[in-house]
């Protein structure tokens, strides 16, 4: 995969909403669970981190009503993840990929093994270089090239100093990760912050997906490049995965949502109903792409004139599988699903929080049709207590 307290946001989202006079969809909120403020990953492939932390912020607020606002530090997680990924890349002689992207599991792994910290205990994104948002244009390519040179070296023995060099590059950009910090008058380590303040248990979180090339109700390593830690997902039939998503939100939960956003129906800047994702029942000529950097222009969604909540395809398990098998469904982007709304025709949509800043007519929030979610969801990470009991029993969780 290449984030106002919700009480304020919900007051806006709960009203029927029309982006502007040319748009045809009007949304009314059915339920909007608490989320934190919209963030901006800017020019970086860190959606996996922003979306996972957005999800964990909601989790912490749900578990601890005294927490009224929360902003977890992306730089801490990315710092820890990139050095681990560099190590894996070198150990596999470059066969395990190294890129800006990542998976939800990277954040769960970081929480379990290194902890988490609140924003403000490391330099804010890119402030060390005179900016206020991530911009990996100058930072990442030299580091990537250095790691590749080590991993693909024909030397019989490599100098272990390479790892200190890479950690230095990472620290120079993000700042060093603190061993202790003060928050709301108390001293924490990253690990005690998770346990004592956030009160989150990494073992509560599971990844769910739906594909037929592995048995249902088993777990498997989802075969995507950014799953470099080889995290496992539980495999459900499509109707049960959709039931988990729907019932979780209606019962007060949110979840991290990984999906393909390269579809023409994922409407961005132009045309009707921008920031709405649908599966229009028409032939698509969308190009392949991923994440914000390729979608801030007018190409994506420009040809859509039927994203009006009607005429969507009926999604089957076979369609999902075909998209995955032939690469038309790709691991593009991580987001957070937090609510359900309906349009003026009574059709339901998931409400999604993005990490592209206050972008579009809904200021960083999107509406995702259920057919789109059924078709293009790669996986979700969710609190296992949000999964219906009968499905948990089938999965053994």
What is each stretch, according to the model?
Residues 16-17, 59, 272, 383:
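Hydrophobic alpha-helical segments
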Residues 11, 54, 261-262:
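Short, glycine/serine-rich, charged loops/turns that create anion-binding
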Residues 164-397:
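Active-site signature of cysteine proteases
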Residues 1-22:
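Bacterial Sec-dependent N-terminal signal peptides
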Residues 22-256, 360-362:
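Active-site nucleophile-adjacent alpha helix/oxyanion-hole segment immediately C-terminal to the catalytic cysteine
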């Amino acid at each position: 995969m290449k984030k106002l307290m919700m009480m304020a946001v919900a007051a806006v989202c709960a009203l029927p909403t029309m982006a502007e006079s040319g748009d045809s969809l009007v949304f009314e909120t059915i339920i909007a669970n608490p989320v934190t403020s919209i963030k901006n990953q800017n020019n970086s492939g860190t959606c996996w981190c922003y979306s996972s932390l957005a999800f964990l912020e909601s989790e912490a607020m749900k578990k601890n009503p005294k927490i009224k606002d929360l902003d977890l530090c992306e730089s801490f997680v990315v710092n820890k993840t990139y050095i681990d990924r560099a190590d894996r890349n070198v150990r596999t002689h470059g066969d395990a990929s190294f890129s800006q992207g990542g998976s939800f599991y990277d954040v769960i792994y970081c929480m379990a093994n290194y902890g988490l910290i609140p924003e403000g205990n490391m330099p804010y994104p890119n402030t060390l270089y005179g900016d206020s948002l991530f911009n990996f244009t100058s930072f990442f390519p030299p580091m990537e090239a250095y790691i590749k040179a080590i991993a693909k070296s024909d030397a019989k023995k490599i100098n272990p100093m390479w790892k200190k060099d890479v950690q230095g590059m990472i620290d120079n950009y993000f700042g060093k990760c603190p061993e202790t910090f003060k928050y709301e008058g108390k001293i924490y380590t990253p690990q005690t912050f998770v346990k004592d303040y956030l009160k989150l248990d990494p073992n509560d979180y599971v990844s769910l997906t739906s594909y037929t090339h592995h048995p249902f109700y088993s777990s498997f390593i989802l075969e995507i490049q950014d799953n470099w830690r080889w995290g496992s997902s539980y495999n459900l039939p499509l109707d049960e995965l959709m039931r988990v998503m729907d019932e979780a939100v209606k019962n007060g939960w949110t979840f991290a949502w990984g999906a393909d956003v390269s579809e023409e129906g994922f409407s961005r800047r132009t045309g009707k109903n921008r920031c709405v994702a649908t599966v229009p029942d028409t032939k698509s000529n969308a190009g392949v792409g991923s994440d914000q950097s390729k979608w801030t222009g007018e190409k994506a969604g420009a040809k859509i004139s039927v994203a009006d909540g009607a005429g969507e395809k009926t999604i089957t398990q076979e369609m999902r599988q075909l998209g995955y098998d032939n690469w038309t469904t790709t691991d593009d982007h991580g987001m957070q699903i937090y609510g359900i709304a309906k349009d003026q025709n009574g059709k339901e949509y998931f409400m999604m929080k993005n990490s592209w800043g206050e972008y579009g007519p809904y200021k960083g929030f999107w509406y995702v049709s259920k057919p789109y979610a059924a078709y293009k969801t790669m996986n979700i990470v969710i609190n296992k207590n949000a999964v219906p009991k009968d499905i948990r029993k089938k999965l053994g969780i």
